[in-house]
Curated annotation (Swiss-Prot):
This is Serpentine receptor class alpha-13. Residues 1-25, 83-108, 168-192, 265-278 are extracellular. It comes from Caenorhabditis elegans. It is found in: Membrane. Chemosensory receptor that negatively regulates RAS/MAPK signaling during vulva induction and the negative regulation of olfaction of volitile attractants. Required for the suppression of vulval induction in response to food starvation. Signaling acts through the GPA-5 G-alpha protein subunit. Keywords: Membrane, Olfaction, Receptor, Sensory transduction, Transmembrane, Transmembrane helix.
Length: 335
């Protein structure tokens, strides 16, 4: 059985010490430290790109930046606990009975990772809601500019930051864990429920985004106008929806992997040794890699939209359509 936490401080098992002495695990932990450093560069670059892009609607831009800020928060916390783990493996193995950390000492890292994982999951839902506003209330949405995004971002931030305190409301944080990557001793059942809810939310977002993408395409075709400005705004709305769809789908898959694998690992932990559990955890925790892929994906999507905008402007300027052709297009959109 994997001893990952305890009520009182316990000495490290021989198998865990052997794992900590393993060059493979040391190299793996060192690699895990490099990942957040590299990702922070791309995350900052993605924020600069979003601030410079006028093609992305204001509200959508706010939510994308919010997602990136959650990712930055996570990567900083992840770097801190991995660096502490590496320090333990290199310099503290001669104190096997002092390797564990109290849940209280790990509280800041746990708050940061819980807030970030919850926030990135909720922002996907917020971006889908934002797209619904953009499609159903197009004129009002354009007038409000960034207000819908700011409102949704504040709600998401409030829920995400409160999540740790809700999950540990009756936890004195007096237990001990092998390192700060583990959940508090007395709250593991609640965190397990949190992972299940995250999984269900990711699946819901996945299905909702597919339906929203189909609806948005039909809605744009129906609302096409002879006015160049209206047609251009429709194209912009559709391209933004496509961008959010691509990013949301990738994030949903990431959330499914993160919550599903961790939930499975927590169930199987009682049948595993501490060494096997630690190795499995380093593989199952996919969020750091998602935070690395996220800014790269955003930059690629922005580049694609920029190219499509140029093509769209040229096609709209050259487009000539009769009344019969316009009605045929509307009829085909609803078949």
């Amino acid at each position: 059985m994997a001893i990952i936490s305890s009520v009182n401080r316990t000495c490290a098992s021989e198998s865990l010490l052997e794992l900590y002495r393993s060059y493979k695990y040391i190299l793996s932990t060192s690699f895990n430290i490099i990942i957040p450093i590299i990702s922070l560069f791309f995350l900052v670059y993605a924020i600069k790109q979003l601030c410079a892009q006028s093609i992305i609607q204001y509200s959508t831009r706010v939510l994308l930046i919010t997602t990136i800020l959650f990712a930055v928060c996570h990567q900083i916390a992840y770097f801190c606990f991995k660096a502490d783990l590496l320090y333990t493996m290199l310099f503290k193995l001669d104190q096997p009975c002092n390797l564990q950390h109290s849940s209280y000492d790990c509280r800041f890292i746990t708050i940061a990772t819980t807030t970030s994982n919850c926030g990135m999951a909720l922002v996907q839902l917020a971006m889908s809601i934002d797209r619904v506003f953009a499609l159903k209330f197009n004129r009002v949405y354009y007038k409000l500019k960034s207000i819908p995004g700011i409102t949704l971002a504040l709600i998401t931030l409030s829920i995400s930051f409160s999540m740790f305190f809700i999950l540990t409301i009756d936890d004195p944080l007096s237990g001990y864990v092998n390192h700060c990557g583990f959940y508090p001793t007395y709250s593991q059942d609640k965190f397990h429920i949190f992972l299940d809810v995250t999984l269900y939310l990711a699946v819901f977002n996945f299905v909702f985004d597919i339906g929203l993408m189909y609806y948005s395409y039909q809605e744009i075709l129906w609302k096409r106008s002879y006015s160049f400005v209206n047609r251009f705004q429709s194209r912009i709305s559709l391209k933004c929806t496509q961008a959010i769809f691509i990013i949301s789908i990738c994030q949903c898959i990431s959330n499914v992997l993160y919550s599903g694998l961790l939930s499975l690992l927590m169930k199987l932990g009682r049948y595993m040794s501490s060494a096997d559990y630690n190795l499995s955890l380093s593989l199952a925790y996919t969020t750091p890699y998602s935070c690395l892929i996220l800014p790269i994906l955003i930059c690629k999507v922005l580049e694609y939209i920029k190219k499509q905008r140029t093509v769209g402007i040229l096609s709209l300027r050259n487009q000539k359509q009769s009344m019969e052709g316009h009605m045929a297009m509307i009829n085909s959109a609803w078949k």
